[in-house]
């Protein structure tokens, strides 16, 4: 179970190394498997905008875990049931969209962490090898709070206004900027090179550096 729980992506990030990843939005299992052999560090399974079901996403997680690539999953929204079920796929990290306030961030972390740090429920899903053997389940519960990456998505001008408060929440590992939604929230849809959009992106990066969060 030790190797099963080890998060190679988080280890690289903690060492200050750059990582390279990609998104998958289609439901083809072969596509996910092929991508995992291309040398990327991680694959983000897009459960927000992608066409795959949660069942298919779970199968993708399993396929990717059989390679040197780390599987990640983006859930549709910051809701406890979606976060819990997403984590039960066994993903090494979860991206949660539209985190606009400190309270949003606190809820996201709470949903991702087991007690006493959070409210994640203990189920016998893929993450714990479907409940057997008991010693390994205990090991997963003990390590998951530290090993599973929590990625908050910053994609609205309100999030930028609150960025220092958001990233001060303990437990956040990565802040991922969504520039298209950011530009739309500012009334500048698609103008990703507009100075105001670029300035907001810079503010997020600066706050990440202050709060020891990976941008």
Protein language model annotation of sequence segments:
Residues 169-194:
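Histidine/lysine/aspartate-rich catalytic loop segments that bind and position anionic ligands
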Residues 49, 158, 181:
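Short, glycine/acidic-enriched loop or turn micro-motifs at the edges of active sites
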Residues 23-24, 43-53, 71-76, 93-100, ...:
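Catalytic beta/alpha-barrel core
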Residues 81, 93-170:
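Conserved anion-binding
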Residues 36-37, 87, 167-168:
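Non-catalytic positions within long, well-ordered alpha-helices that form the structural scaffold/packing
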Residues 54-88, 112-117, 142-145, 192-215:
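Alpha-helix-loop-beta-strand connector modules within alpha/beta enzyme cores
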Residues 1-71, 77-78, 110, 150, ...:
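Conserved N-terminal beta1-alpha1 strand-loop-helix module at the mouth
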Residues 1-21, 134-146, 202-210:
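N-terminal amphipathic alpha-helix/helix-capping segment at the start of soluble metabolic enzymes
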């Amino acid at each position: 179970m030790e190797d099963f729980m080890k998060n190679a992506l988080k280890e690289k990030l903690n060492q200050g190394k750059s990582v390279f990843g990609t998104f998958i939005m289609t439901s083809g299992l072969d596509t996910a498997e092929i991508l995992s052999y291309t040398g990327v560090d991680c694959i983000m399974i897009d459960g927000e905008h992608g066409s795959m079901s949660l069942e298919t996403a779970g199968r993708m997680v399993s396929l990717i875990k059989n390679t040197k690539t780390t599987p990640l999953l983006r859930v549709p929204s910051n809701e406890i049931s979606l976060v819990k079920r997403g984590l039960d796929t066994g993903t090494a990290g979860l991206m949660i969209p539209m985190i606009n306030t400190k309270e949003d961030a606190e809820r996201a972390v709470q949903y991702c962490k087991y007690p006493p740090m959070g409210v994640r429920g203990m189920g016998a899903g893929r993450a714990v090898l479907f409940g057997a053997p008991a010693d390994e389940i205990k090991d997963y519960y003990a390590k998951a709070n530290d090993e599973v990456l929590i990625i908050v998505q910053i994609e609205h001008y309100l999030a930028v206004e609150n960025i220092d408060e958001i990233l001060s929440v303990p437990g956040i590992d990565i802040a991922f900027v969504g520039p298209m939604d950011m530009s739309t929230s500012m009334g500048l849809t698609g103008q990703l090179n507009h100075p105001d959009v670029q300035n907001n992106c810079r503010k997020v990066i600066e706050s990440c550096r202050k709060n020891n969060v990976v941008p």
